[in-house]
Amino acid sequence: MKVKIETAANIIVILVAVVVGSVFLKDRFFSTPPEPNEVKAGDKLTNLEGWDWSAHDQTLVLGLRKGCHFCEDSAPFYQRLTTQQQGGSNATIVAVFPDAADAVKEVVQSEGLRVHALAGVPLERLKISGTPTLLLVNRSGTVVNAWIGMLSPRQELEVMKATTEPTAADLKLPDPLAKK
């Protein structure tokens, strides 16, 4: 009789341990991870100190960080972008860094980037969770397109095309509803 009671108690302890363990393991290993807070087209960005979205038809934001090897590896593409900008791009390029001003100046000069550079910008304010991140932003501060990480040649072409296509302001089409 004593053996049966001990066996029953052991079985109950094991069952309770399995139930409690499965609850913790389920939450730990099988729960849905939270959505990343990454920027996407349609997001409205807050104003940046030192930058006015409305002063530019489009702004191409380069979210960079000193020491980011993907940013360094992408520097030749960023140089081509700045050359394109001088040749008629409709997007103003601004590089934002979370780093201090002296570090930003060093990166911009060493990589030969001809861009507006803003230092000390918390990248989270722009919903940038990793570098490099490129954002095409319209004059109302809305993200038109976003590219995250080191870009493939196809993505580089997308960026080049997006920054050379005319905007609605460039087209200056007549308003069909305007009174004559």
Residue spans of the language-model regions?
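Short, low-complexity, Pro/Ser/Thr/Gly-rich segments in the mature regions of secreted, periplasmic
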Residues: T167-K180
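Short acidic-hydrophobic, aromatic-tinged amphipathic segments that line or gate anion-handling sites
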Residues: L45-G50, R114-V121
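Structural beta-sheet core signal
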Residues: L62, I93-A95, L136
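N-terminal targeting signals for export/organelle localization
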Residues: M1-K44, L157-T163, K180
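Structural microenvironment flanking redox-active thiols in thiol-disulfide oxidoreductases
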Residues: E72-E111, L177-K180
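Short active-site neighborhood of thiol/selenol oxidoreductases, capturing the structured segment around
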Residues: W51-E72, Y78
